[in-house]
């Protein structure tokens, strides 16, 4: 693989990792104790320009292990459901992606840098390329299939970490509009939520928090759900009560008064509301 070229990354939160267990029957050959950073990539570029990036794969286990790496397509619905697709989906940009290798050997309690490149063809239209890099631990019997390119998401795996990659081409950006803030009933419990529309051509997210006080005088923060709002979507996102120490706050007593600012990449929304 050639040396990666510089990239331009949009602001993002501190990197964390998510372990998604995906056992589908059978016994586990070994614990899947892997961490990956960053948790996602938010990049910008243009057609005809190669972008290089790297992630760190950390083995937290006291024994050496091997993981496999591949790309997958994904979709996040307006209702908040994520789906993964091994087959190329319409408009997929995965053919633009070159991975350093199919598998990585990790030493006990050690780390490896893993490189990948994205090369959008010249003349690619403005928009957002989205895919995930899947780092998987698998049963030994499945290693040959994966390395031979014959793996599918239906194979039993001991674990998977999926790292989202977003590439905004030729200035693609979100355009968010906060349409509503209200209290609603969900699963028999009251919650506070905001409805946000994205009329842009790249994904967006809400950040920031609101200061809130309930009818019993208890103060807490309301923090927006940090999941993506894809282009063309209108999503209702929960505002989660959070205590000063960062832990979940008790269920508030209504009415609740809330004020403050919710931020997104290109702006912010000033909020002042009484929620019954």
Show the residue positions of the predicted features:
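Ligand-binding face of N-terminal immunoglobulin V-set domains in extracellular IgSF glycoproteins
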Residues: 52-56, 100-105, 110-122, 127-132
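Short, acidic/polar linear motifs in exposed loop/turn regions
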Residues: 60-63, 82, 122, 197-202, ...
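Short proline/glycine- and polar residue-rich coil/turn motifs
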Residues: 104-111, 226-235
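Beta-sheet-dominated interaction scaffolds and their linkers
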Residues: 30-65, 101-105, 174-193, 226
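Surface-exposed binding patches on compact interaction domains or structured appendages
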Residues: 31-38, 62-116, 207, 214-219
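Terminal connector regions
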Residues: 72-74, 119-166, 245-276
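Bacterial N-terminal signal peptides that target proteins for export
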Residues: 2-17
């Amino acid at each position: 693989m050639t040396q990666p070229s510089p990239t331009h990354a949009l602001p993002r939160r501190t990197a964390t990792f998510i372990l998604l267990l995906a056992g589908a029957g059978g016994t586990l050959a070994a614990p899947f104790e892997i961490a990956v950073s960053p948790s996602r990539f938010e990049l910008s570029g243009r057609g005809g320009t190669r972008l290089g990036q790297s992630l760190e794969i950390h083995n937290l286990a006291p024994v050496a292990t091997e993981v496999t790496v591949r790309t997958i397509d994904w979709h996040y619905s307006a209702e908040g459901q994520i789906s993964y697709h091994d087959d190329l989906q319409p408009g997929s940009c995965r053919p633009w992606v070159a991975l350093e290798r199919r598998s990585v050997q990790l030493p006990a309690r050690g780390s490896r840098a893993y490189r990948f490149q994205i090369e959008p063809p010249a003349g690619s239209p403005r928009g957002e390329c989205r895919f995930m890099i899947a780092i998987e631990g698998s049963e030994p019997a499945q290693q040959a299939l994966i390395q031979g390119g014959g793996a599918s998401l239906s194979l039993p795996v001991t674990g998977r970490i999926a790292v989202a990659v977003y590439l905004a081409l030729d200035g693609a950006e979100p355009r968010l509009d906060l349409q509503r803030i209200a209290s609603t009933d969900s699963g028999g419990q009251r919650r506070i939520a905001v409805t946000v529309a994205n009329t842009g051509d790249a994904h967006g997210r809400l950040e920031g928090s609101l200061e809130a006080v309930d009818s019993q005088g208890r103060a807490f923060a309301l923090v927006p759900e940090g999941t993506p709002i894809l282009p063309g979507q209108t999503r209702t996102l929960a505002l989660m009560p959070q205590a000063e120490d960062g832990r979940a706050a008790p269920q508030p007593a209504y009415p609740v008064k809330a004020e403050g600012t919710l931020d997104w990449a290109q702006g912010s929304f000033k909020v002042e509301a009484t929620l019954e």
